[in-house]
Curated annotation (Swiss-Prot):
Pfam (any one): KTI12
Transmembrane recorded as keyword: no
Gene name tied to this protein: KTI12
SS bonds (residue pairs): none
Primary localization class, coarse: cytoplasm
Name assigned to this protein: Protein KTI12 homolog
Consequence of gene loss (knockout): Defective organ formation due to disorganized shoot, inflorescence, flower, and root meristems leading to stunted roots, few root hairs, lanceolate leaves, and a highly enlarged, disorganized shoot apex that does not produce an inflorescence. Altered cell division and cell differentiation in leaves. No detectable 5-carbamoylmethyluridine (ncm5U) modified nucleosides.
Protein family: Belongs to the KTI12 family.
Binding site for ATP: 8-15
Keyword entries, A-Z: ATP-binding, Cytoplasm, Nucleotide-binding, Nucleus, Transcription, Transcription regulation, tRNA processing
Span list, region Calmodulin-binding: 260-273
GO CC term, one of those recorded: nucleus
Expressing tissues: Expressed in roots, hypocotyls, cotyledons, shoot apices, stems, inflorescence apices, leaves and flowers.
GO biological process, one term: root meristem growth
Length: 302
């Protein structure tokens, strides 16, 4: 339906803007279904999220993955986070383009002094504020959106330090109109992104890889169950096809095997966001799963 990226310095009123926009959309004539994806939904500590680059990269990966799953639900998805890096906003724009939906950026333009003051007030109230060092680092690295960039356009700018942001705010109403306006052949002021061949191919490739991973891991589970069902105690499961054997020192029940399989598939999906891609053939997927099981069984048997 649509993807809205909330952008701004730390403690610049982004969450207020996100909630206000969501409520206004829900109360609009079209009664839109809205979902806010924010950092709090992952139950992670704010300062831990930005303590170092790996932690920050992990947070962005979680947000991006959640957005990717949500844009096809028919809801308007609002991403309430710093979204301070232009390369990351470009990635979110690519998700919207691949889904063929509307996209916009809402920028909370607040000067550093006000953000710093609001962060201090939040900490003084015992709320979740940023540590001084982390706050200054985030301010320094912030990349302001520019409407000339396709991934920052259309750009709706709010000024929370100068005006109260509520459902009657002109910019909020303008954004609601953009997100809900009926599009026909005569509409010129609303743009629905069109997926390119490259983005469609990437989604097909990812879906194919997930299918291969799911099928290959299930075959390994079936082989373990089958060889254990022969009756005699075994310490090794042989798989053939030039795959290494699986070393086991105790009977492994089907519930445990299923749990390990689910964990492995989840880990593979998360690591593909920032590390090596998912395997595209069955043998590679099986080999990775066998290596994972040997590590798990080795640790459990020690």
């Amino acid at each position: 339906m649509a993807l809205v990226v909330i952008c701004g310095q730390p403690c610049s009123g982004k969450s207020i803007a996100a909630v206000t926009l969501a409520e206004t959309l829900k109360e609009s004539e079209t009664k839109q279904s809205v979902r806010i994806i924010d950092e709090a939904s992952f139950h992670l500590d704010r300062n831990q999220n930005y303590a170092n680059m790996p932690a920050e990269k992990n947070l962005r990966g979680k947000l991006r993955s959640d957005v990717d799953r949500s844009v096809s639900t028919g809801e308007i998805v609002i991403v309430d986070s710093l979204n301070s890096i232009k390369g990351y906003r470009y990635e979110l724009w690519c998700i919207a383009r691949a889904a063929g939906i509307r996209y916009c950026v809402v920028y909370c333009d607040v000067d550093e002094a006000h953000c710093r003051q609001w962060n201090k007030e939040r900490s003084d109230r015992g709320e979740d504020g940023y540590d001084d060092g982390i706050f200054e680092d985030l301010v320094r690295r912030f990349e302001k959106p520019e409407r000339r960039n396709r991934w920052d356009s259309p750009l709706f700018e709010l000024y929370p330090s100068r005006e109260v942001i509520d459902k009657s705010s002109p910019v909020i109403l303008e954004a609601v109109t953009y997100l809900t306006k009926t599009v026909d052949s005569k509409t010129q002021d609303v743009r629905i992104l069109q997926p390119s061949i490259a983005t469609q191919a990437a989604r097909f490739s990812e879906a194919n890889s997930l299918y291969e991973l799911d099928r290959a891991t299930q075959e390994i589970i079936n082989a373990i169950v089958e060889q254990q069902s022969l009756g005699a105690a075994i310490s090794r499961v042989t798989l053939g096809n030039e795959l290494p054997p699986i070393e086991i020192c105790r009977p492994i029940g089907l519930p445990e095997l299923r749990r390990l399989r689910r964990t492995f598939v989840k880990l593979m999906g998360q690591s593909s966001l920032s590390g090596p891609p998912l395997p595209t053939d069955a043998d590679s997927a099986k080999r990775r799963f066998v290596d994972y099981l040997n590590r798990e069984f080795g640790g459990n048997n020690a």
